[in-house]
Amino acid sequence: MRSFYFNKKDERVLFGDIREKETHLLTNGQTIHIEPDEVMDFRSIPYPDESFQAVIFDPPHLLNLSEKSWMRKKYGVLDKETWKDDISQGFSECFRVLKTNGTLIFKWNETSILLKDILELTNHKPLLGHPSGKRMGTHWVLFIK
């Protein structure tokens, strides 16, 4: 989703998502639009090595959501059986397509899984991080390749 971009149509941004174009009307009247520039799986990014100077990795962070859950519609859901491998592959792919000295921004919410458990899934060490959100459960983590 483009929710944290200042300019939702910024041409410098390539938004990839495994979901195709979707629109969901939530019970609170809010509409969620998922409109990736390119449908792709973060476990297999269709770009050559060192293609990007900056990458934002914002994978699903929730487990155990019903099919009708608004959070599932907005954020997606992790597979209970494969989430560790999926996130590990995602990190590998993000670092593969990131240029040397490039920046990876990783966003994670600890509702289902602690950040420390996620950071064990990559050999790369973060430079810094910042908790945010109502309960300080969302973390923005910066890596330099």
Predicted regions and their residues:
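Class I S-adenosyl-L-methionine-dependent methyltransferase catalytic core
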Residues: 1-145
